[in-house]
């Protein structure tokens, strides 16, 4: 055996010794409790407990019911119906019956000192607890009745309708059409069809009794809650008239109850009011995250629900701001007739209507009459010089042209091909200078002209600097001209012309006297 196995064995011995010591000290009740815990966990019964306890003494109902439920019913159902049997609920019901027959007087002093105000707050708080209790008992009934009709929980979703259906059917699923007249005919038809093919088994009599009692408790809690809500709605308009005028009596009562009073509600900032009651709506199955987001009771108010979904977020924000003001006004007993709440609600409704208005259409404006008059263009020496500088040259014009039926020459420039157009085509050896309009031609000043003329008179043989020794021919292109060669050609041509002349061939006689008169 390894060291790890020895350590585990020692720990097991210590645990067994501790359990046996505790069992000996507590007596047979501890063994019974250990048996119940093992039954709840579903781990079976240990051999030691099998020897010490007689399994046949455990009732059949405790074996068929869940262990938690069996233990609670063994205590005379006190743990299951704690709220229904509580003195707090009875006191609130008695208080509501007492004040229901009297007319509520306007509160003049501190609102926290009024007894009926505290009764209203407690009534609204216990109404929320009743919702939790109904949901808990509803889950319990579904767990019990699942063995008899497992498909029923998916066919009837409402807690009160489900309990009425279970109380009407119990173990007898035949003739369900005549027993379920309170349900829609389509639902009754589906239940009757499903009951014929259900895989459930009949429940024992004790289980049926417990299920029936639990359904009756749910119905009774629903009736008590309805009484409390009617009382709160009848009194909330007197306690908080402005708040009730803004969001209604039901939402006002829920907000006051969850905030812990009207004074505490007035201390809430407007940005936190939409989240009040979110957990409550989720618990009772009303809240839908896809629709309501992080909103609570304020989202379920009438003024918000009647607005389209796309503007509800803005409606909640505007309503929350007015609710915060109305709660603070009601806590100091201002505007007891609710005039502020009425005006605030009208203002919110007016703003919502403004949000729902379609966007205003822009009027169709005719196009302006085109101005065909000649535009004024800038002139002057600087503008003319700039135009001449950036004017398109003859070379660029030739490059932009392509001769018909001739291949265009191309050159490569930085990995790009550039066409030359008609540049370099045969028969095109002329280059025309850029034509300049005489009207806009840049002219020299008179002083500069006189200076150039005087320079030309002083040195008439001086070259102007514009002469060139280059010539362009259609055969060889650009040629370099030799001035000496041109002069020699002229001399040769002159000699050739006068070489055959008569006058140039007459020989002079040396014997002839130079002067005939001599």
Curated annotation (Swiss-Prot):
Residues 112-147, 205-239 form a coiled coil. Its main location: nucleus. GO terms for biological process: mRNA cis splicing, via spliceosome; mRNA splicing, via spliceosome; spliceosomal tri-snRNP complex assembly. One of its GO terms (molecular function) is RNA binding. Signal peptide: none annotated. The record marks 271 as: Interaction with U4 snRNA. Keywords: Coiled coil, mRNA processing, mRNA splicing, Nucleus, Ribonucleoprotein, RNA-binding, Spliceosome. It comes from the Eukaryota. One of its GO terms (cellular component) is nucleus. It is found in: Nucleus. Belongs to the PRP31 family. This is Pre-mRNA-processing factor 31.
